[in-house]
Swiss-Prot record:
PROSITE patterns: GLUTAMATE_5_KINASE (PS00902), PUA (PS50890). Residues 374-393 are annotated as: Disordered. Its main location: cytoplasm. Substrate binds at residues 57, 144, 156. One of its GO terms (biological process) is L-proline biosynthetic process. One of its GO terms (cellular component) is cytosol. It comes from Sinorhizobium fredii (strain NBRC 101917 / NGR234). This is Glutamate 5-kinase.
Length: 393
């Protein structure tokens, strides 16, 4: 079979998940030369205009090496102690290796709850987006020092998929000691076939998943397929590849064996379809004609264009946006609680801090969190009843 070249530079934003066994050796500790080579690959992508995020395993594995903990399963408190020690060493290692190419690393510790609870989700996304805007590479890991369920049952494959959907990435790369998906475990079945392209994750594909690879890694093919379901449903492609080569990303681009999972549409389309599909908006915001014009030209909704706030909703809830005639023209995720939104309605963004007592976000509803549900010039149904508009991204 001819090698399949996969140019990564065609993607806008890539999340790379790195397994523990790639970063940490049980006896010698951190694999510094591998990490340095990986950072060279990341720098090459950034030089081509690609935004890169890293979900890095290895804190517990590195910490247990530093603390000289015995081999085998760790108790919960031992895992948390290992994470506390290992996270410092891991962050320092990433920072030093990336700095060789004048790249600044930013550390973010998450739990799965941070990607599922709306307020924490929005805060985490805003921080990550700001780091990317500033040219930094976010280095993300589970907050294993305080998490309990995540340490015992969690994994960074699924966390990486949630991060990819949260930031609207168009590619997720899972690097470990597994080079892709086979129809059966190849070390058990010599007839196992390698699957290079997976158009859809079917029950048959799910049945091919296996178990964890080693005590240093909590992931296996099962969690990678689960991650694939999360990512591809949100419009993000996924690659499973071996990270064993010293330049794993360059190896993928050169045609090294890997499995590619096709996305379902684009990240923007998937996200906006979800927003438009919310059946019961928590509230509504009425806007003036000028704000409607701005929204239809692709801009965010600013407080100055808001005329009325209706309902009780929290930041991150889905709300309807009504034009001056009372017609729903868009839906989006609220940037403020209802009470705060009422206070700043009609006000300039520069006045927000003085009114609320804190410097909030500039937009009432950011354009990335909004979808137009009615085309320009649409008229209300006779009798005032409205038909829900189609998706207009």
């Amino acid at each position: 079979m001819a090698a399949t070249v996969r140019p990564l530079e065609k993607y806008r934003r890539i999340v790379i998940k790195i397994g523990s066994a790639l970063l940490v050796d049980r006896k010698s500790g951190l694999k510094k030369s591998w990490l340095d080579a990986m950072c060279v690959d990341i720098a090459a992508l950034k030089a081509k205009g690609v935004e890169v995020l890293v979900v890095s395993s290895g804190a517990i594995a590195l910490g247990r090496t530093v603390l000289n903990l015995p081999a085998g399963a760790l108790k919960l408190e031992e895992s948390q102690a290992a994470a506390a020690v290992g996270q410092i060493a891991l962050a320092r290692a990433w920072s030093e290796s990336l700095s060789t190419d004048q790249i600044i690393a930013g550390q973010i510790l998450l739990t799965l709850g941070d990607t599922e609870e709306r307020r924490r989700y929005l805060n985490a996304r805003a921080t990550i987006n700001q780091l990317l805007k500033l040219g930094s590479v976010p280095i993300i890991n589970e907050n294993d020092t305080v998490a309990t369920t995540e340490i015992r049952y969690g994994d960074n494959d699924r966390l990486a998929a949630r991060v990819a959907t949260m930031v609207g990435a168009d590619l997720l790369v899972l690097l470990s000691d597994i080079d892709g998906l086979y129809t059966a475990p190849p070390h058990l079945d010599p007839q196992a076939r390698f699957l290079e392209t997976i158009a859809e994750i079917t029950p048959e594909i799910e049945a091919m998943a296996g178990g964890a690879a080693s005590e240093l890694s909590r992931g296996g093919m099962r969690t990678k397929i689960d991650a694939g379901k999360i990512a591809t449903t949100a419009g993000c492609a996924m690659i499973i590849a071996s990270g064993k080569p010293e330049h794993p990303l360059k190896a993928i681009e050169a045609g090294a064996r890997s499995s590619w999972f096709a996305p379902s549409g684009s990240p923007v389309t998937a996200r906006k379809t979800w927003i438009a599909g919310q059946l019961l908006p928590a509230g509504s915001i009425a806007i003036d004609a000028g704000a409607e014009t701005a929204l239809r030209s692709g801009k965010s909704l600013l407080p100055a264009g808001v005329r009325q706030v209706t309902g009780t909703f929290s930041r991150g809830d889905t709300i309807a946006i009504l034009n001056a005639s009372g017609r729903e023209i868009a839906r989006g995720l609220a940037g403020y609680d209802a009470d705060d939104a009422r206070q700043i309605a009609g006000k300039k963004s520069a006045e927000i801090a003085a009114i609320l007592g804190y410097a909030g976000r500039t937009a009432m509803v950011h354009r990335d969190d909004m979808v137009m549900t009615a085309p320009s010039g649409a008229r209300s149904e006779e009798g005032g009843n409205e038909k829900k508009g189609k998706l207009h991204a």
